Amino acid sequence: MFTLISSPLGSVERLIIQKQNGAELEILTGWGAGLNAWRIPTEKSTLNLLYGYQTEESFWKIQNDTSAGVRLAPWAGRTNNAIWNWKGETFKLDNNVSWAKHALHGLVHQKKWLLKSFTSNNEKAILTLAYDWTGNHDGFPFPFHAETIFTFTGHSFSVKTKTTNTGSKEMPYSEGFHPYFSLGEKIDNLTLKIPVSEKVLVDSTDIPTGMRETETRFNDSLLGDTFINDCFAIQNLVEKSETILKSSSATLSVWQNSNAKEYRFIQIYTAPDRESIAIEPMTHEPDVLNHHRELTVLQPGETLELEWGASVAIHQ
């Protein structure tokens, strides 16, 4: 069985789904529906497979730079110079980082999400959170209703998202998630395998140029000191694409539904301290609100459903 525990991180609302064997999935409902921890009991200790915030002090100190675990919508990644265009209109967003002039990660990643439901049985627990974007913002005047549905079994979780255009006009839309994964040791010691992909080429400000090149580096390859901060376009658009991270003691599979209009891209980022790696499912390249390549457009009343997740196997 599973228990839902309310355990605020200081002033930030936090829920923990706890399995009877001690496995836990921790979600910051008060901050972007963010995945904050995934703890698995092993023979020797407890393994936390997600980088997150341990104290309120560390949260407020680094959350704006890391955005760890949060849902990214109605765009993911960078919007160039915090300006975008749609049907002849220009919209101005907030430049929300100090190190670039862009707008990053959408509009819901720092919002409080509401608990809609929680159910569980012997096999799994399902937590549903909801958020309504009213459209009362000159930078994105398109209202939508969003739900994030977490299903947790202990050694796996999935995240299903639903987004409904609640306005009267067509709505451009893009989405991603921003989890940082860890296997309890430096990522230098891990191997990485990604789906067959093309690397998205970017300019000096990390905005896609429209060009891509075949990616061949990551096929069960040792990470070593490799720095990655790249977006990859998945080439075989199938129901599930897998990114696999391995250590000597565990294998982590991060999967994403990658059919047309789903998570067709992955952003991968190696954290500077080499303790974690962001593996981010994305529907589009960064800056899609400007370049419009394969842009998703939701009609009034239309709902988009997406899904990704992760599972771990422990080698005893």
What residue spans do the PLM features occupy?
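Beta-strand-rich interaction surfaces with strong enrichment in secreted/lumenal proteins
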Residues: E147-I149, R293-L298
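Beta-strand-rich N-terminal accessory domains
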Residues: M1-L93, V97, V238-K261, E302-I314
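Acidic, contiguous internal or C-terminal segments within carbohydrate-active enzymes
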Residues: I17-K19, E24-L25, T29, Y131-Y173, ...
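Extended, loop-rich substrate-binding clefts of extracytoplasmic carbohydrate-active enzymes
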Residues: M1-L9, N85, E89, D94-T153
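Acidic/His-leaning functional-site neighborhoods
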Residues: H102-F118, F218-R293
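Extracellular glycan-recognition regions
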Residues: N136, G224, H315
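Active-site/ligand-binding surface loops and adjacent short beta/alpha elements
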Residues: K92-L93, E170-P172, P179-N257
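Short, conserved secondary-structure segments in the cores of folded domains
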Residues: N80-N81, N136, E294
